Amino acid sequence: MAESTATTTAVPPPAEESWNADSEDVHQFYWTYTEEPHKSRRAAILKAHPEIASLNGYEPLTKWIVLGVVSLQFTCAYLLSQSSLLSWKFFLTAYFIGAFCNQNLFLAIHELSHNLGFKKTLYNRAYCLFANLPVGAPFAASFRPYHMEHHAYQGVDGMDTDLPTRAELILFDNVLGKAFFCTFQLLFYAFRPLVVRRLPFTLMHFWNIIVQFSFDYLVVRYVGWRALAYFFMSSFLAGSLHPTAGHFLSEHYNMTRTRLIASGPGKETPLETFSYYGPLNFFVYNAGYHIEHHDFPYVAWTRIGKVRELAPEFYDNIPDCKSWCGIIYQFITDSNVGMWCRVKRKQKHADIPTKSMHLHVS
């Protein structure tokens, strides 16, 4: 069960006006005063299906998959250590093998951040550092606290760093801008938190940096700089115009703008979390089951599909993403959707932590 401890202070709502359904300019975020939806959904689902609580827990298989993926990436890096970065062999391997592998590791770190790889928290933290190695840059230590806040404060402006900023909305409000965002999407997820909400530097960050840069040095020293370049290219492509990168958009972007307009202020709050049930889940620990994950964040990937099976009445009527490739294409080319298709919350009576949240799972 999650517990949080933090120093709090009341924070006023954002200065922006609430979204107006009658406004001629619909290119703005949808603001709502409602709480994030998954807490109440979880209570309702457990009331109807208490057996779902038994699905909570870690999955031992995860560590072996991570070991295999890390080994595969190191093998590819070694085999490409004498190849030109500009060769088709290098690029195609990075795109069709490396990007799938590193996206797998991104989502493995996501599972481990929820303590779903091992029974003990320390083992999950340590294995995050191992899974981080082929990514090239240290990110596992930073990901966890930001991601825990994303769950606890979904949609809260200034707290949920998954949300685009006003500057991003303005800069990427056309086809070229959205194409640029999708191409370099991983960089926005990496640097946006530094602008929106900086969290304290911890011992975990220190070890993440030491372990990662030591590994990078050893790779360059004994295998060659091209091997390290392969790791970085794999990570870049995984967060760029790649099929698995569609999950970044499918999770919380409401791609049917008319659904927002039809449920303006004073009406039903629009949907803000979506799932994808397609075959690419095979590569990413069923990360497409995103509504289910937010409803039950401590159910491991091998059992998350069971949530929907046990409580179909809570999921079958919610629109789902049919294609991760398709949603990237739609996001870029459709003038009716864009950075603004996100729900943001104004919590007038909520206390927001001024420091990092410390979440513990028992």
Curated annotation (Swiss-Prot):
UniProt GO molecular function: sphingolipid delta-4 desaturase activity
UniProt cross-references to InterPro entries, sorted A to Z: DES1/DES2, FA_desaturase_dom, Sphingolipid_d4-desaturase_N
Reaction catalyzed: an N-acylsphinganine + 2 Fe(II)-[cytochrome b5] + O2 + 2 H(+) = an N-acylsphing-4-enine + 2 Fe(III)-[cytochrome b5] + 2 H2O
Motif Histidine box-1 positions after renumbering to this chain: 110-114
Phenotype caused by lack of the gene: Results in the dramatic reduction in the endogenous levels of sphingosine.
Annotated disulfide bonds: none
GO annotation, biological process: ceramide biosynthetic process; sphingolipid biosynthetic process; sphingosine biosynthetic process
Composition bias, Low complexity: 1-10
Transmembrane segments: 60-80, 90-110, 121-143, 169-189, 200-220, 228-248
Family according to the record: Belongs to the fatty acid desaturase type 1 family. DEGS subfamily.
This protein's name: Sphingolipid delta(4)-desaturase
Protein source organism: Schizosaccharomyces pombe (strain 972 / ATCC 24843) (Fission yeast)
Gene coding for it: dsd1
